[in-house]
Amino acid sequence: MKILFVLISILYAVYCFSSEEDVDSAYLANELEPVEDINSEQYAALEPKEEQERSCADMGQDCKDDCDCCLNIATCNCRFGRYFCSCTFGDYQTCLRKKGKCKRNRPQSCPRSNLNRKKG
């Protein structure tokens, strides 16, 4: 089943690249006319705003260590060793570790779960 999926993926990729080359070659041979944007003058005056780098990463974004993640209980989970790391939910112990080691994005308080507390 996996081999069939890989084979179909390769065939689809080859098809996409070949159809893209057909359009490019037709455009270069002046067989297709370029599309003119009606609103191009309207957007010409607007300059693109540069994205400012955040000091911390939200859940699911790339990270290098636990201190890169925004939430107090968020941890940096790495698949395949040190590759493909992203912020995921941690626990109370994660928050305590971050409190001890992080200088930036340091948690002020660690939330405790109410599951283990006795009422009464």
From Swiss-Prot:
Q: Does the keyword Secreted apply?
A: yes
Which pairs are disulfide-linked?
C56-C70, C63-C76, C69-C87, C78-C85
Predominant subcellular localization, coarse grouping:
secreted
Q: Which residues form the propeptide?
A: 17-54
GO MF annotation terms: toxin activity
Mind telling me how this protein is modified after translation? Contains 6 disulfide bonds.
Tissue occurrence: Expressed by the venom gland.
Location in the cell reads: Secreted
What residues does the Agouti domain cover?
A: 56-95
Q: Would you name any one GO CC term?
A: extracellular region
Q: Which UniProt keywords apply?
A: Disulfide bond, Knottin, Secreted, Signal, Toxin
What residue stretch is flagged as signal peptide? Answer: 1-16
Can you quote the domain comment? The presence of a 'disulfide through disulfide kOR' structurally defines this protein as a knottin.
As for family, the record states: Belongs to the neurotoxin 05 (agouti) family.
Q: What's the protein here called?
A: U13-lycotoxin-Ls1d
Q: Which organism is it from?
A: Lycosa singoriensis
